[in-house]
UniProtKB/Swiss-Prot annotation:
Residues 142-164 are annotated as: Disordered. It comes from the Bacteria. Residues 154-164 have a biased composition (Polar residues). GO terms for molecular function: heme binding; metal ion binding. One of its GO terms (biological process) is cytochrome complex assembly. The chain crosses the membrane at residues 9-29. This is Cytochrome c-type biogenesis protein CcmE.
Amino acid sequence: MNPRRKQRLAVVGIIGFLIVSAVGLMLYALNDSIDLFYTPSEIIEGKNGQKPQIGQRLRIGGMVVPGSVSRDSESLAVSFDLIDTGPTVTVTYTGILPDLFREGQGIVATGVLTDVGAIKAQEVLAKHDEEYMPPELAEKMKGIKHVKPENMPTYESSNGAGSK
């Protein structure tokens, strides 16, 4: 092999190494911003045989379990349970919930898995249209009935106000 050919091969090798390194660094950087979508059943039982890791960022979608919303009177902290067709997952969130958030309504939350079955959400999005649902969630939630707000039971308060 002549010196000129060796020099070309070395240049091609260096360029190839730099391209592979750049792609590797981009994938590593993107890994922190990827949020995988899960349903409550997939968080508890695993998705394709793999459960999400504690501390992993993810998106979860499901229906808010009626009667599960608990608000802290001292702060904006709220916790609620999400369900699809199986087990429930508890979501905690500190902030102002969307206007369309209510029990029996579909939501998508973005956050971190803090424990098996527990999510600390940084963002909560409520479904805008009664008919729309993300395709991943729609597939998992076939057979769950949507609870309309006007059909939600209300309970008597201590001052006698209330209906139904």
